[in-house]
């Protein structure tokens, strides 16, 4: 269910092209902000792994910038809205008090 090479990540029906900076879901292009693109890329690089808010902050925003942890929640909400816009199943799992994971088996 997961495939990746140097420039392309695939998970379920989501394809992320790193070099072209493009994302599609079920063949439909999805336009993401640079921050949401980085978040999705990080989640897709390790599907199933729960990423803490702290880890997401340091990898996506960089350790030099002070950003509140709830900023992660706001961007995850935006990312969910964009990748689920076509009525697709939500693949981002929230682990309360911990962080987020990309998970194809939510609620199964």
Predicted regions and their residues:
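Active-site beta-strand termini and strand-to-loop segments that position acidic
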Residues: 11, 25, 105
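Positively charged, aromatic-enriched patches within helix-turn-helix-type DNA-binding elements
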Residues: 20-22, 27-91, 96-98
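Intrinsically disordered, low-complexity protein-interaction/activation regions
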Residues: 102-108
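Basic, amphipathic DNA-recognition helix from helix-turn-helix-like DNA-binding domains
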Residues: 1-10
